[in-house]
């Protein structure tokens, strides 16, 4: 386990990913009778079936477990033969929940305080992931270039996101009140320690409380605002490549899901029924009685 931790750290994996991977491997080790470095294909297939069948875990959770085991056997133990025995389960495409711009305004307006309000505005205006927002530093805000820098985003990649004038105004108001020193959103309950970032749980609570106060019945999470950011940009005319860069997607295919969510793109597509001329005979029966065909 220590070798795996060292390899994860060496490869600059996020702290949350390291914790999740080690936890998944620990569970696997407790499940199998064989020493972990002597595990064979049958053990892996049995565990895979156990996760999906007996425990009935969500597919995403099973994928995380498979990722952890692949890392252990392929990257740490150098057993590349294990790759075929650790297939990813097939995932269904589930369209994420999207709020209308009006609902987003309601949500932000229902924030408990200025701290929460600024968090919600930043999430929606930048499309940041929850962990990325937590790690934001005051120095990452470039008001001269009107850009927000995301350092070491998912996959360890830096990127920049345009900074809106409205968000900059909100951040300035927030800065005058909070006076953050290092992290833009400092942690602890009373937000007094500038050397620690806010926890992801606090971000989730800020969104959850605002959802309840706004009377929104949809299931809203911090990631919902990321989906709203991308979908509303697409509906405003932004191209997929630009959205991909702002979201930090390594693959354009991950961004194409928003085509399914954009009303503008769906409604702009000509319906085939509109393209044909249907004859309308004068003697078309108008009776409500249905007759069986002869």
Question: What is each PLM-predicted segment?
Answer:
Residues 1-294:
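Conserved catalytic core of the tyrosine transesterase superfamily
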